[in-house]
Amino acid sequence: MSPNSLIFGVSRRTLLSALAILSVLPETLLPAGAQTVDAGGPLPSWNDGATKQAILNFVGTVTREGSPDFVPPAERIATFGNDGTLWCEHPMYVQLAFALDRVKAMAPLHPEWKDKQPFKAALEGDTKTLAESGERGLMELATVTHAGMTSNEFGKIVTDWIATARHPRFKRPYTELVYQPMLELLAYLRTKGFKTYITSGGGIEFIRPWSERVYGVPPEQVVGSSIKTKFQMRDGRPGLFRLPELNFVDDGAGKPVGINEHIGRRPIAAFGNSDGDLQMLQWTTMSGGVRLGLIVHHTDEAREYAYDRNTSFGRLDKALTGAAVNRWVVVDMKNDWKRIFAFE
């Protein structure tokens, strides 16, 4: 997702810096069929056509022993963005929705917020004023609502929120708004000897606790943005304490860096949906050999959302232009997917 796109008038990088500290979700919110491959054939929620065939051809080429393009299992690394690639990112990022709700939940203990910006704007849903507060305002919101506690304490807050929060349009838990075709793709790749990694601009601690249940991706195969934490003994007990200080933003040019630091191997397949995935796609597909780059293009306003170049969330501009030049596969969500969510 593009560091240059604007979210409430502030940069995507600023949002990620502010919200990288999110932690855990409950293990019970597994969408139906999230980790299965249909016995009747791979990718059952994908319509037959050029897009599906490109995926199958790539996998067949790199996994067929004797092929000149055969890739050993140890080198079969596939990386996936999260927001907009694996689950819904509109009308706003889930982590931003959490931050705004957190301000409202804490407001009774802070009566001064009703007259103090940017808290006043958050309480009133005044996005215009939130935008005018800029980077400093957003960081202030994040610092107050997300830091100054242990990881366990913050995890409990997030767990309680995710259990009751619902998407404003679909009225379902956010963890049910994962894309069934992408879940099938993850599972299919694993049956072919791939290791599947999440490489998200979102908070690494926000994704890791539930990624295995929802996506089949274990926590050690999640790469994301983070804040600094500090180990301390308090009252004779060890704890990791969250600090209001950025550690790493896994977005844009940071994604290849994060992949290299966490994985130690260059992917042979990368999947994204926005300009924030551009450098990951470039780094993957320009490494020589048979490689796959794929972009999820949101084109289905009826079943989900339709957006690309003109949006504050998940802007797809440079990467869409680069897809033709680099021969990346572009998924037309409306025409390539039989269904988007498991509950359809």
Where are these regions (language model features)?
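A metal-dependent, Asp-based hydrolase signature
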Residues: M92, A97-E176, Q180
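Asp-based phosphoryl-transfer active-site loop
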Residues: R76-H90, L281
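C-terminal cap/substrate-recognition subdomain and adjoining C-terminal extension
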Residues: L19, T36-P42, W46, Q53-L56, ...
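N-terminal post-signal-peptidase region of extra-cytosolic proteins
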Residues: T61-G66
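Short, solvent-exposed loop/turn and secondary-structure capping segments
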Residues: E89-M92, A97-L100, P209-W210, W283
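N-terminal secretory signal peptides
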Residues: M1-V10, A18-P26
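Short loop/turn motifs at secondary-structure junctions and domain boundaries
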Residues: P68-P72
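Signal peptide processing junction and immediate N-terminal pro/mature segment
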Residues: T28-Q35
